[in-house]
């Protein structure tokens, strides 16, 4: 996700926001072709079907001229100085926006600076992670059982966060950073994903592509830009996209879960047998676990003990993955312009969350070292991050989770444009962008 600094400022003024057009940088810029970050809606989420990035610009520019009142431009800064990056960081809700990584730096160059210790697997630390997740999830279920109705949202928030830790454990297993025994990793990963009704092997296969093609237009299996031709395809589709990227965006990972993991046609022939085993495990859990829950506590109990924590998990799944790689200055590039080192270092965001979230989710937010090498266990990510800050810190994007950061992502990072990175929905279809207008007015603009 190589990035360059957009040649403009995104101005926040109370509840209203403006994203000016970004003039094209000089050809000498290390990042010539910025991309965009967004997620496709419903089955279009995360590359439901292929689009052609080269055809994106024309339909976008066709609609911009009639909505000048929606996005008033401001004077574009140089964008090359530390002062300009600091201004952009402040306006986007970041602590730091990194400098352009030189073109001649490779991913191996960065990896070679990491201490060897960060790659070491420690069975006791891995077991500690499992105990933290099992204990916190059990505590969450107890809280749900004992809480009066008005405290249930807090119990659900805790339990949804705790069960996200199960996903991170399975995530380590998929990257072969949990145990030196592959069979143990497959068993633990499958079991950890079961309460989430997430098929382990299908997710593993697709997630490997995310790491191999991070922020590559079309090919990345994580959040993809909204292609302009799809945004323009029909009024119904446009409204669905706007709503999906509006109020329900923090749960849009549910669409990714449905779209990517249950269709055997999406997998290679060599993968299908393992995919079938994972699907059988998930369906068995649903066939046995769900009726058992209903038998014990009824349909409302199923909603109370399983569905609401599951929605809490998907809030974090969507939020973490959005924040990891989404910002107005982070490009999404076509394959012929993509650079691995820039994508993994410049295009990944380190974001600090409240400590209890980081503990329950096993430091999944410490994401830059994970993209330098997925083989780093979650319990070594902080040591690896410190090393990266010492050696490559000026190139990194740093943030603390805040309202302005989320407001930027949810109200600005929408439609792909090669020149501007993102074009917000309300610049293209202001009359249909009421959900975005609502978010601009309703979401606070705080950074603290």
Curated annotation (Swiss-Prot):
Xref: Pfam families: FA_desaturase (PF00487)
Record remark on domains: The histidine box domains may contain the active site and/or be involved in metal ion binding.
Purpose of the protein: Chloroplast omega-6 fatty acid desaturase introduces the second double bond in the biosynthesis of 16:3 and 18:3 fatty acids, important constituents of plant membranes. It is thought to use ferredoxin as an electron donor and to act on fatty acids esterified to galactolipids, sulfolipids and phosphatidylglycerol.
Similarity section: Belongs to the fatty acid desaturase type 1 family.
Gene Ontology CC: one annotated term: chloroplast inner membrane
Name under which the protein is recorded: Omega-6 fatty acid desaturase, chloroplastic
Entry EC number(s): 1.14.19.23
GO molecular function: acyl-lipid (n+3)-(Z)-desaturase (ferredoxin) activity; protein domain specific binding
Pathway: Lipid metabolism; polyunsaturated fatty acid biosynthesis
Catalytic activity: a (9Z)-octadecenoyl-containing glycerolipid + 2 reduced [2Fe-2S]-[ferredoxin] + O2 + 2 H(+) = a (9Z,12Z)-octadecadienoyl-containing glycerolipid + 2 oxidized [2Fe-2S]-[ferredoxin] + 2 H2O
Primary location: plastid
Motif (Histidine box-2): 207-211
Membrane topology: Multi-pass membrane protein
Modified-residue entries (N-acetylvaline), positions: 70
Motif Histidine box-1 positions after renumbering to this chain: 171-175
Transit peptide: 1-69
Annotated compartments: Plastid, Chloroplast inner membrane
Gene name tied to this protein: FAD6
Membrane-crossing residue ranges in chain numbering: 124-144, 149-169, 282-302, 303-323
Claim: Transit peptide is one of the keywords in the record: yes
The keyword Acetylation is annotated on this UniProt entry: yes
GO-annotated biological processes: fatty acid biosynthetic process; photoinhibition; unsaturated fatty acid biosynthetic process
Motif Histidine box-3 location, chain numbering: 367-371
UniProt keyword annotations, A-Z: Acetylation, Chloroplast, Fatty acid biosynthesis, Fatty acid metabolism, Lipid biosynthesis, Lipid metabolism, Membrane, Oxidoreductase, Plastid, Plastid inner membrane, Transit peptide, Transmembrane, Transmembrane helix
